[in-house]
Structure formats: C-alpha cells, structure tokens
C-alpha cells in the first residue's frame, strides 16, 4: 500500500512540476496541415502562430504540397505557398520573420516521399533564398521521412529535425532536434470533452516531463481540437498546441493568457 501511495505521489509531483502556469500566446500554436486552410501560410502567419506545417512530395524534382499523393498539383509547390511569402515577410520586417524580433517561427515540413532526396532538393532551393536561411528566428524542421539520425549533422544550421522520444540521441544529434512530436493516441483516447481521466493525465505529463528534461518543446498530433482540450494542454505544459482551427485557437489564446 505504501509503495502504491509513493508511486501516486511521485506521479502527482511530476504533474505539478510540469503543469506550472506560463504565459501562452499564439506563438504556442501549431497550424496542422496548414495547406488545407483557405489561405495557406497567411492565416496562421497573420495570427502569429509559432509553427506552420506543410506535407511535401518530391515529384519530378518539385516539392509539391498535399496531404495525399493523389491531391498534388503542379501549382501548389512549397516555394509558391511558403518560401516566397516568407521571403516577402522577412523583407518587410527587415530581416526578422515577424515584426516582433523576439518571435520565432518553425516551418515544419513533413516529407511523404524519400527524406534524403527531398532534403537535397530543399537545401538547394533554399540557397536561392538568402533572407530565409540567414533569418535567426526562422527554422525549417523536417518531419516524416527523415535521414538517419547519425547524418543530421550533415545538414546546415537552418535545417533541424522533429524528434521522437523513443530514440536514443547523442548530444550531437540532439542539438539538431528543434521539437519532439508524438501521437496523442498513444497516451489517451480522451476526446476533449468533460475531464481528462487521471490515468491519462499521468501518462501525458510523464511524457511531457521527459521531453522537457531534454530541454526541448513538445507537440502532440491527432489531439482533440476543442477549447476545453486547449485549456488542458496549457495546464499540462504542452509547448505547441496542434490545431486545424486557426481563428478559434487565436481567439482562445488571446483571451486566456
């Protein structure tokens, strides 16, 4: 019985240490599958989001943005939807990604085809966008199909990677990890309504604690996308709140700092 109480106390202490309140803003918001928005890039950018996601397919030498290969269009390239608009914003902001010099932005690129080949094309393409690769508050974070972790150091500083908790990273590898993402369903089936079950809270906060011990921010994908869930994720200390509802999350974060 004493052992059980000790375990619960430790878990509760972990939850308390993680769930310390901090100031949240739209910098803590992640636009999931952003290209499916009515105005890709601009809606999330204008809302001040800290992370914007684009899925890419390398087809005939072009990086095409789509959720499924069957949905690709030659007009919807990564360059047209994201790189060119970013370059224009950085020019307007005199070298910064946002008018606020302290505000950062991750462009999370989910490679749906071979990651090494896609990265070769991406790094070559980015060389023609000097303002992007020299912008200190902009990072390109590679997710999905990625190179081997041992090869991360071969890529330039402006290319970083989306990490996974189960991988045993060396310090050199870890230095190339910008964020750790994980599938929400591994830890909970809670749908964002009513209260988060205590057992799920323990699983989620234990994982969050492990990521924070690595000094990395965390994001869950396929998580509930409701105001109640957003509030819970804030209390748990999730660094990037995943959403398809840009305007709704923007309003929530502005009202509930």
Which residues are covered by each model-predicted region?
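Bacterial Sec-dependent N-terminal signal peptides
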Residues: 1-24
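Phosphate-group recognition and catalysis centered on beta-loop-alpha active-site segments
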Residues: 19-257
């Amino acid at each position: 019985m004493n052992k059980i109480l000790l375990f619960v106390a430790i878990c509760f202490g972990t939850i308390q240490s993680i769930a310390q309140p901090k100031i949240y803003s739209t910098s803590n918001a992640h636009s999931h599958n952003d290209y499916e928005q009515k105005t890709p890039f601009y809606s999330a950018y204008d809302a001040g989001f800290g992370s914007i996601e684009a899925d890419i397919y390398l087809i005939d030498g072009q990086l095409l943005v789509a959720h499924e290969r069957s949905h690709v269009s030659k007009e919807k390239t990564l360059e047209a939807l994201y790189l060119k608009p970013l370059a224009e914003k950085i020019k307007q902001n005199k070298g910064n990604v946002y008018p606020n010099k302290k505000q950062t932005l991750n462009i999370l690129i989910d490679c749906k085809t071979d990651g090494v080949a896609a990265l070769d094309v991406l790094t070559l393409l980015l060389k023609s966008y000097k303002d992007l690769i020299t912008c200190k508050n902009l990072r390109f974070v590679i997710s999905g199909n990625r190179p081997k972790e041992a090869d991360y150091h071969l890529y330039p500083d402006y290319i970083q990677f989306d990490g996974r908790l189960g991988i045993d990273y060396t310090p050199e590898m870890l230095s190339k990890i910008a964020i750790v993402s994980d599938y929400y369903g591994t830890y909970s089936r809670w749908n964002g309504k009513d209260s988060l079950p205590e057992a799920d809270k323990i699983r989620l906060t234990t994982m969050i604690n492990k990521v924070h011990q690595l000094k990395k921010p965390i994001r869950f994908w396929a998580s509930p996308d409701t105001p109640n869930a957003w509030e819970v994720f804030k209390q748990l200390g999730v660094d990037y709140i995943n959403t398809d509802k840009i305007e709704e999350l923007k309003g929530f974060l502005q009202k509930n700092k």
